Design a protein with these regions (language model features):
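Membrane-embedded alpha-helical bundles that constitute the cytochrome b-like, heme-associated redox core
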Residues: 2-228
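Intrinsically disordered, low-complexity acidic Ser/Thr-rich regulatory segments
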Residues: 52-56, 494, 543
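Long, well-ordered mid-to-C-terminal structural blocks that present hydrophobic/aromatic surfaces
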Residues: 93-96, 103-105, 109-110, 722-760
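N-terminal accessory/cap region of cofactor-dependent oxidoreductases and related radical enzymes
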Residues: 226-527, 532, 537-541, 552-729, ...
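Acidic, glycine-enriched active-site microenvironments
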Residues: 546
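Catalytic cores of extracellular degradative/oxidative enzymes
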Residues: 549
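Short linear, low-complexity motifs centered on an aromatic residue
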Residues: 756-774
């Protein structure tokens, strides 16, 4: 087949050369001296010569003209095929046409120099040469022509000698093609003496080539190694030296974000799974392959990536049937990765790990200030409601969990207590649970930590990480999860906590969302049974097999719906900048838009045009996992308020105030820990609680807005209370312990300039003064503190520095997961399941289970924005 393509193009070249020679002779014979002829032939002759220079129209002259026409005739398909050269067939045609066009160009140069310009070699080096025969030599500016010919010839030789996809060769080839296009476009379209035929050929070339570029952008995934991509990224890197992306017009800002994501994908994904295992007894075994893994998620995350079964899986506690967070086995696929080079992972790079004291930072820069009446000064985030705060914890419980820390007597951190602090006794902080696959004295690479949850976006906070966990919450009938038929609530275990996948750090907000999406799972089951009644009625299957089929698909649909809600509802609510509204919808639907995706399906393999779901999975050079830096930027505890004043749905009446802390754990107003939902429902309905969360604001993610009740918590294990903790101080300490760089170093590693002063870090002079007193130098400021101090872009609920990590990892969670890419198909989800995901969002989920909210949610464009009561 390849030989046939070469023969075809070679034959076309020979035919064109015959036509050039014969046509020139014929045209010269029809162009005698004297008055112009009349008739059809004369009209054709006049059209062909229209706009050409008034010189002697000999056969040699016409060979020059016709040979350059033949060159552009062959060059146009060469340029078009080059755009699609990742295809084997297109690459073959490109090589053939590129070579043929070059040979035609050499013929043109031969006739131009040897015949028209009298064989004067000076024409190669001079901008204009005239001869006695041709006072106006056609080659007015030959130097670029010959430079192009030399470069083009070199590339033709390379095209036949080197077939490997080498980076420098791709860049060189892209450059010479762009030069050829620019020069031929200039000579054929912009030159005043080119003639009407040349103008038409140049315009046709431009239309076809630019059309192919457009088609390429639409139908194929972007190649970040292409010259166009390199220039695209380089343009925005240069532009950002003068103006930040969020200051650009919307579409230009979206393009800037896409360029920034390419930079981050190429420079900010670093494997820890390659670090050798040195503790064999801590290595978790890989389960054998089963064909069912092709179309269903495993509880522990194995076999999501079929080529690397352990990629992104959870660490394991083989002694706990529910795979609890006190894991004792793991493998490299469960490790947290890094968004910074491994050589940068050093807990002591920026000084002593306890300097300055995390407690001092907590007291002076994080704690909510006291008001005149002795309360805590709460700074609200006016763009969000409290559901948004609950939602992000609901999601992070799915994503990451470093496990139960080491025991309090196992070499804890002894945090210095500032003078005059009221903290009772010593502040001892447990260390992070170590990676079981590495010995404590292993210095072959940076310290690594394992994830007690799967790294995949798989709704493990509801469905758990083990089959035994599923046995707790499933009904084993019609694929449904257990709910009380009278209250529609998840049943409680003996401790008063809902029976669901993950219940650590439990409070009312988590309870509401676990209950809501348990109801949603069951609604999806009903939808599937209606669409496929044979699933329930199939006599060839046992009741458990019928249940398993419905459960599997309902879980996949519910899981993907939550991912969609996070992408197109939650993120645009907390990032209201116009560019983000476009970009986040494009992540899911593509720039072609929701309606095109719904009614025409994917019109492109490109994630930019048709969205990530259904595109081709890509690990972008590093095994998929979540990262320590991703964990660090999701420290959003200021979102939580001091307390929650219930508002009753009917009449928006005030109710009692629910508390996050109490001296008595049996306090009926306490909504943290066991019985959180039971306490809240004492004199309120479920819809009252949903309504309350919809109308109240969470806290702003800024300095001096960390809830004080979280700075004097008692660590809870089940119903057992242990040591008192300051969560703000622990947040600071955890980043240092895990080698997350401090603020300025972090900015540099994420391609942002470091701040030079505390006044540049914050516009508040009092905060700048406090920062100076606590840290002394901007380079010592902790990442979390710097992000909270930073003035965010317009409409942002958090800093641009944190957003850098989100740009990279938000799309990676989708793009690396085959169940959102290659296997996001009706074969896995069913068409009814895909339609359910397409046609629903957070608003429709709420209305399905609480239709009374219709008047309010119809007035509210985003369910995570403050609800418009009237």
């Amino acid at each position: 087949m390849r030989r046939a393509r070469y023969i075809f193009v070679g034959a076309l070249f020979l035919v064109l050369m015959v036509l050039v020679h014969g046509g020139a002779e014929l045209q010269a014979s029809l162009d005698p001296p004297g008055p112009p002829a009349e008739g059809t032939v004369a009209a054709l002759q006049a059209w062909l010569t229209s706009g050409l220079p008034a010189v002697a129209h000999t056969a040699a002259y016409y060979r020059v003209i016709f040979s350059i026409w033949a060159t552009i005739f062959l060059l146009t398909p060469a340029l078009c095929f080059h755009i699609f050269s990742r295809s084997t067939a297109a690459n073959t045609y490109w090589r053939a046409f590129w070579t043929a066009a070059y040979l035609a160009f050499l013929v043109h140069i031969y006739w131009a120099v040897s015949r028209v310009c009298g064989g004067d070699v000076h024409v190669v080096f001079n901008s204009k040469v005239a001869t006695a025969a041709f006072p106006e030599c056609l080659i007015e500016h030959p130097r670029p022509d010959f430079l192009l010919a030399a470069w083009w010839g070199l590339d033709v030789v390379l095209a036949w000698l080197i077939t490997d996809n080498i980076k420098w060769l791709r860049a060189e080839r892209g450059a010479v093609h762009m030069l050829a296009f620019a020069m031929f476009f200039g000579a054929f379209v912009l030159a005043t003496k080119a003639g009407i035929v040349a103008h038409l050929l140049g315009i046709l070339m431009a239309i076809l080539v630019l059309g192919c570029v457009l088609i390429r952008l639409i139908v194929q995934e972007n190649d970040p190694k292409s010259l166009i991509a390199i220039l695209y990224v380089g343009f925005f890197q240069f532009l950002n030296l003068f103006v930040r992306w969020d200051k650009l017009p919307t579409l230009l800002g979206v393009s800037n974000l896409a360029a920034l994501r390419e930079v981050l994908r190429s420079k900010n994904l670093h494997n820890t799974s390659d670090i050798a295992v040195t503790e064999e007894k801590g290595l978790r075994p890989t389960v054998p392959y089963d064909p069912r893994y092709l179309c269903e998620r495993e509880d522990d995350g194995q076999y999501n990536d079929l080529s690397k079964p352990t990629m992104g899986n959870a660490a394991l506690n083989p002694d706990d049937p529910f795979n609890g967070p006190e894991f004792t086995q793991s493998n490299p696929g469960a490790r947290f990765g890094r968004n910074i080079p491994l050589s940068e992972v050093d807990p002591t790079r920026d000084g002593d790990i306890l300097d300055p004291s995390p407690r001092l930072v907590s007291n002076r820069l994080l704690a909510r200030r006291k008001t005149s009446d002795g309360g805590d000064d709460f700074k609200p985030a006016g763009i969000l409601n409290l559901l948004a705060a609950a939602w992000i914890q609901f999601q992070t419980h799915d994503w990451f969990n470093h496990g139960t820390p080491r025991p309090i007597d196992d070499d804890p951190f002894d945090v210095p207590i500032p003078p005059g602090d009221s903290w009772p006794g010593k502040m001892l902080v447990r260390r992070t649970r170590p990676d079981p696959t590495r010995k404590p004295n292993d210095h072959a690479g940076p310290t690594t930590y394992a994830n007690a949850e799967t790294h995949w976006w798989d709704a493990s906070q509801i469905y758990g990480d083990s089959p035994q966990a599923g046995a707790k919450y499933r009904t084993w009938k019609d694929g449904k999860l257990a709910v009380d038929p009278n209250t529609r609530l998840i049943p409680l275990d003996p401790t008063g906590v809902e029976v669901t996948g993950l219940t650590s750090n439990w409070w009312l907000g988590l309870s509401l969302l676990h209950n809501l999406f348990t109801l949603e799972h069951n609604a999806i089951c009903d939808h599937l049974i209606k669409a496929f009644p044979e699933w329930r009625d199939d006599p060839q299957k046992t009741p458990l097999e019928k249940d398993a089929q419905i459960f599997r698909v309902a879980r996949m649909v519910n899981n993907s719906l939550m991912a969609k809600i996070h992408t197109v509802d939650w993120t645009p609510a907390i990032l209201t900048h116009p560019a983000l509204q476009v970009a986040m919808n494009a992540n899911w639907w593509g720039l072609a838009g929701e309606h095109v995706k719904k009614y025409l399906g994917r019109i492109s393999t490109s994630e930019a045009i048709s969205g990530i779901p259904g595109s081709v999975a890509n690990q972008t050079g590093a095994d998929y996992c979540l990262t320590e830096e991703f964990t660090a930027v999701y420290r959003l505890h200021p979102l939580l308020p001091n307390d929650i004043a219930v508002r009753h749905f009917q009449g928006d009446r005030p109710g009692r105030t629910l508390k996050f802390e109490a001296n008595d754990l049996n306090d009926p107003d306490l909504i943290v820990g066991p019985n959180a939902m039971t306490n809240a429902l004492r004199d309120a309905s479920l819809i009252d609680l949903i309504y309350t969360f919809g109308v109240h604001n969470p806290g702003a993610v800024t300095l001096q807005n960390f809830p004080n009740w979280m700075r004097r918590m008692r660590r809870r294990t089940g119903t057992k209370l242990e040591e008192m903790i300051d969560l703000a101080a622990i947040d600071i300490l955890r980043d240092r312990e895990r080698g997350v760089p401090r603020y300025n170093r972090f900015r540099k590693l994420f391609h942002k300039p470091p701040v030079r002063s505390f006044e540049e870090m914050t516009s508040d002079p009092e905060l700048a003064k406090t920062l100076r007193e606590v840290y002394g130098h901007p380079d010592k400021v902790d990442l979390m503190v710097g992000m909270y101090a930073e003035e965010p872009p317009e409409g942002f609920g958090f800093s641009d520095t944190a957003f850098r990590v989100f740009i990279l990892m938000a799309s990676r969670r989708l793009k690396s997961d085959r169940f959102y890419t290659d296997d996001y198909t009706p074969a896995v989800y069913t068409q009814a399941g895909i339609d359910w995901i397409d046609n629903n969002n957070m608003t429709t989920v709420l209305l399905r289970h609480f239709p009374e909210l219709t008047p309010i949610l119809q007035r509210t464009p985003n369910a995570f924005a403050p609800w418009k009561v009237s």
